[in-house]
Amino acid sequence: VSYLEDEIEEVRSYISEPFSQTIDCNQGWHQLIVDCHRELSAIDPDYKLYQVKEKFGGLRYYIDSSSKDYYALRDVINKFERLSLQTCEYTGEPGVLAKGKGGWMKTLSTEVMSEYGYEKA
């Protein structure tokens, strides 16, 4: 998935100060993030990105925009957040919600689940 590094750097460049330019999830979701960014920037090239992370097993993409198309932006984000719940965070392959020790949730492929100590939720 390293071929996405340039595109991920472009997404990072949209992260507003004082927020860290960290994308806090594994590379299996990088394609989702790049595609989400492309769709968002087509609607509002000046949108501000605050944070991209994994939370409760799904992708979270936090933005701000003064665009009159704010609801269209939210629809794009909602679409990619839903897609993340079907995509392994490590491999980008189809995945399902899995539960690990301590109740941590991740979306993982069945091949990766046991390797990381998770089981289907």
Residue ranges and their predicted role:
Residues 1, 115-121:
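Short intrinsically disordered terminal tails
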Residues 71-87:
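Short, mixed-charge amphipathic alpha-helical segments
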Residues 88-91, 109:
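Short cysteine-rich clusters marking metal-coordination/redox-active sites
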Residues 93-99, 114-117:
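Short functional micro-motifs and their immediate structural scaffolds
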Residues 102-115:
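Cysteine-rich micro-motifs
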